[in-house]
Structure formats: structure tokens, C-alpha cells
A protein has these predicted regions:
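N-terminal low-complexity, Ser/Thr- and acidic-residue-enriched intrinsically disordered segments
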Residues: 1-81, 159, 176, 198-201
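Active-site proximal beta-strand in glycosyltransferases
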Residues: 5-8, 136, 152-168, 190-194
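Short, conserved loop/helix-junction motifs that constitute active-site signature segments
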Residues: 38-40, 152-155, 183-187
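Short, well-ordered alpha-helix to beta-strand connector turns
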Residues: 41-42, 133, 189
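Conserved nucleotide-sugar donor-binding subdomain of glycosyltransferases
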Residues: 81-135
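Acceptor-binding helix/loop patch of EC 2.4 sugar-transfer enzymes
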Residues: 91-92, 96-109, 113, 149, ...
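Membrane-proximal helix-turn-helix segments that form the acceptor-binding/catalytic region
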Residues: 125-127, 176-192
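Short His-centered aromatic/hydrophobic patch
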Residues: 140-143
Length: 201
């Protein structure tokens, strides 16, 4: 049966570890609340970072098993990846530019390199799970490159992307040195959604 694969930077739960024991804590974020019922239906799954760095392989295996009980698939990221891809490119480049505050942006090449490599990590996780007829539903600015990365490998995939923050005018967007790659990444989706008509324009 065809399934929906939801993909976001974070899973709708946070993985905790205490006394070498793993547990799950439900997220209170809007995305987790809004899509909470969807990923638990009909074999659907949710792919994302579990909110914690796990270095030991046995911990990763245990985490995968625990998350699988909730139809969740982790993408494990190192502290360095979180700092450069998420805190760096996502929050110090895309966030300020997309909110019309480009003077706060830090256009670091290293941030961009990590942003690309982490998007590729997410692609690899998806490719291990996608089957004919599945729909891939990607969420938000942390994964702008992902639609085309998937399309390059699986041309017939059904891909949707939704942007949960504003999308700037061209006059602002063109300030990003990697704007062409970002737009190309987004256009790998069959359907792109925005919050407002102004964002579409």
C-alpha cells in the first residue's frame, strides 16, 4: 500500500537518554501537533532528527527500534552538523533573509557545505524507504535542497514541499550567494505550498 513519508528537520518527538536508557518525549511544536495523526495512519512514516546526538552504534540501533514503534525514522546528526547546518545556514542565513532582515545574515561557505551534506543525508534516508506510489511531503526551510536531490535519483517520485516561514521577494532573495541552487532544489517538488499569496509572488 502506498504511504506518505513526512520529512522535517525534527521528529515530532525528542529522544532522551538517562542512565543509558532511551525514552521519547512528545514535541509541543505546531508541526508535530498538526501532522500528529497523519503519520500514524496506514503505514505512513515521519523522518527527521531525533533531537539528540548519539555516538555509539548500539544506542543508534536501540533508538531506531524505539522510534519505529511510533512510525518514526531518525536521521542522526552530529553536534557539528547541527551547529553548521541548523544553527548556521538555516538560522543565520535563511531565517534572517526570509524574514527581510538580511543585515543579520552570515553568508559562510562552511555553513552552505554542511547544509548541502545534511540535505543529502535526509535524501539517503528517504531512498532507503520509498516505494512506488509513495508521496514524500517535505517541510520547511531546513530542507530546501531535498526535493531535487530526491528527483535526481527517483524521477517519478511524487514530492510535495511546504514552506512554514515567509518567502522573500527576489530583491531580498538574490542576496543569498547560493540562490540558484536553492531555487533548483525547491523546484524538484511537484507541488510547493506557502502560507500566503505574497509568499507565492
Amino acid at each position: 500500500m502506498a504511504k506518505t513519508i513526512i520529512v522535517s528537520n525534527r521528529l515530532p518527538v525528542k529522544l532522551n537518554i538517562e542512565n543509558n536508557q532511551l525514552s521519547l518525549q512528545v514535541s509541543e511544536g505546531g508541526l508535530a501537533t498538526g501532522l500528529g495523526s497523519i503519520y500514524k495512519q496506514d503505514g505512513n512514516i515521519w523522518i527527521g532528527w531525533p533531537g539528540i546526538e548519539l555516538e555509539q552504534q548500539d544506542q543508534k540501533i536501540a533508538a531506531q527500534a524505539l522510534l519505529a514503534e511510533e512510525n518514526l525514522v531518525p536521521v542522526f546528526l552530529s553536534e557539528q552538523e547541527i551547529q553548521k547546518y541548523y544553527e548556521g545556514f538555516s538560522n543565520e542565513v535563511l531565517w534572517p533573509v526570509f524574514h527581510y532582515m538580511p543585515t543579520y545574515a552570515l553568508f559562510e561557505k562552511e555553513y552552505w557545505a554542511y547544509y548541502k551534506s545534511v540535505n543529502e543525508k535526509f535524501r539517503d534516508a528517504i531512498l532507503g524507504l520509498i516505494e512506488p506510489g509513495d508521496t514524500i511531503w517535505i517541510h520547511d526551510y531546513q530542507l530546501l535542497l531535498l526535493p531535487q536531490l530526491i528527483r535526481d535519483v527517483t524521477p517519478d517520485a511524487t514530492i510535495a514541499f511546504f514552506q512554514h516561514i515567509p518567502f522573500p521577494s527576489f530583491e531580498i532573495f538574490r542576496l543569498i550567494p547560493w540562490r540558484s541552487e536553492i531555487i533548483a532544489g525547491m523546484l524538484g517538488a511537484d507541488l510547493i505550498g506557502f502560507h500566503t499569496y505574497d509568499d507565492v509572488r
